[in-house]
Amino acid sequence: MTLLPGLLFLTWLHTCLAHHDPSLRGHPHSHGTPHCYSAEELPLGQAPPHLLARGAKWGQALPVALVSSLEAASHRGRHERPSATTQCPVLRPEEVLEADTHQRSISPWRYRVDTDEDRYPQKLAFAECLCRGCIDARTGRETAALNSVRLLQSLLVLRRRPCSRDGSGLPTPGAFAFHTEFIHVPVGCTCVLPRSV
């Protein structure tokens, strides 16, 4: 699975927001100040419609694309079985031959949904390593001879921040602006040699 198309789109979006979007930059003489929205202009939890149109491909980024399936699985799990374990599993090849990559890995991980109301997208899938070490492929059990570490993806998001609508510099109650920000999102885990002490 390649993440390149999604990353290229997010880089393009960042450039557009920085150079071509007057509603985020403010008026021509505001020197790049983002537009300050009132609660009436944009209700809490919503992003500007023009950003939603441009950000249609946001859903191609793995941390965004996984959210709906994770929430559906979590809903089913409440009725069918206990929640997924957070302990390092014993790897039994006969049980995981048709499982997803994160379950067949010798540094297995699970996903959780991270929610931030001041971020757009508000929900992202974060990977969490299940083992401190890695699983020995011969025994199927964890070994401390290797370490599991997270793989991080840089993702462009929009961050809501309080702003002033009257030019006083003091935040106007309920008003906010959108700022672009790159964050590091854990998308998986891999096995590495331990750092020497």
From Swiss-Prot:
Gene Ontology annotations for the cellular component aspect, listed alphabetically: extracellular region; extracellular space
SUPFAM superfamilies for this protein: Cystine-knot cytokines
Induction: Up-regulated by bacterial stimuli, including by lipopolysaccharides (LPS) in gut epithelial cell lines. This up-regulation may be mediated by Toll-like receptors TLR2 and TLR5. Up-regulated by various pro-inflammatory cytokines, including TNF, IL1B and IL17F. Up-regulation by IL17A in colon epithelial cells has been observed in some cases, but not in others.
InterPro entries hit by this protein: Cystine-knot_cytokine (IPR029034), IL-17_chr (IPR020440), IL-17_fam (IPR010345)
Annotated GO MF terms: cytokine activity
Subcellular location: Secreted
Disulfide bonds: 129-189, 134-191
Keywords: Cytokine, Disulfide bond, Inflammatory response, Secreted, Signal
Signal peptide: 1-18
GO biological process, one term: cell surface receptor signaling pathway
Family: Belongs to the IL-17 family.
Record function comment: Cytokine that plays a crucial role in innate immunity of the epithelium, including to intestinal bacterial pathogens, in an autocrine manner. Stimulates the production of antibacterial peptides and pro-inflammatory molecules for host defense by signaling through the NF-kappa-B and MAPK pathways. Acts synergically with IL22 in inducing the expression of antibacterial peptides, including S100A8, S100A9, REG3A and REG3G. Synergy is also observed with TNF and IL1B in inducing DEFB2 from keratinocytes.
Assembly, per entry: Binds to a heterodimer formed by IL17RA and IL17RE.
Name of this chain's protein: Interleukin-17C
Organism from which the protein derives: Homo sapiens (Human)
